[in-house]
Amino acid sequence: LGEYILQLNDNEPPSHIVMPVIHKTAEDVADLFHAKHGTPRKTDPAALTREAREILRPKFLSADMGVSGANFLIAETGSTLIVTNEGNGRLCTTLPRLHVAITGIEKVVPTLEDVTTLLRLLPRSATGQAITNYVSLHTGPKRLEETDGPQQFHIVLVDNGRAKLLAGEMREMLRCIRCGACMNHCPVYQAVGGHAYGWVYPGPMGNILTPSYVGLENAIALPNAATMCNQCGVVCPVKIPLPDLMRKLREEQMQRGLKPWPERLGLALWGWAAQQPALYSLGTRIAVRFMKWMGGTEKLIHRLPLASGGRDGRDL
């Protein structure tokens, strides 16, 4: 449902990998449905869900092909496993005559027994549930004796930089099960929102995955978008050392000379000022007054000089 809301809103990118429209209120969705569906405006979440169901159900019933992802791939049985809290996943994978599952190569686990461990970790870390409302296993097209399911079933394995990631220092990121726990506890993510990260993955996981996939020179700010409080490392259910990996990327930035000179100069000046307590105190008082002036009567800062990106998704 969240992805449908984003698609209606001119394909707006999600702000969270588990809860893609967490940045929107019920009033925002009510305005969007009223504008796009031409229906009376309503703000009750249950009514909005019913409205979306009435629009989407005929599309599921008439679709010739369903495209899904997969949370895990089980090598022992050749199955895909999908966990959801909505029924849309099963409608998409069982009603159309053709089902195509697209997922990354890192999702493969050896056996059903192995996947049960991950199945206990994922919902607890993502939404606090013991298990999601729906856990769906798909193992090929429907058999002759079965009454439902697709006539054809295809799995598309996506590499897109994952094999290269496996061969490098960031290989531990391939353990990520996409639960979103790291961003839920990240003070930087909470301050700037998911859109400020500029690509598919927000939060601490995005600070590492985005530079790894698109190139460090194309995502210079992300490894520095962390306070190194280690909350992400503590809550990660698969024990990825996220702060350590971000620190390695910062070191690589310095070694390759990727940090722009204004940032290097600013850090040098800050380091000098931090050694002068009286001067540092004066500077912070001036900065506070400047930010109050920037906020004006709204008490909101929409843009900060020399700080591009961080305020693109949220006001200060």
What are these regions (language model features)?
Residues 18, 22, 45, 104-107, ...:
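Generic alpha-helical structural element
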Residues 1-168:
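The feature marks the mature, well-folded catalytic cores of soluble enzymes
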Residues 296-316:
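Secretory/periplasmic and organellar redox-cofactor proteins
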Residues 145-173, 184, 188-303:
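Ferredoxin-type iron-sulfur electron-transfer modules in oxidoreductases and energy-metabolism complexes
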Residues 53, 136-143, 270-274, 307-311:
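Amphipathic alpha-helical surface "interface" segments used
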Residues 77-79, 113, 139-142, 202, ...:
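Short capping/connector residues at structural and topological boundaries
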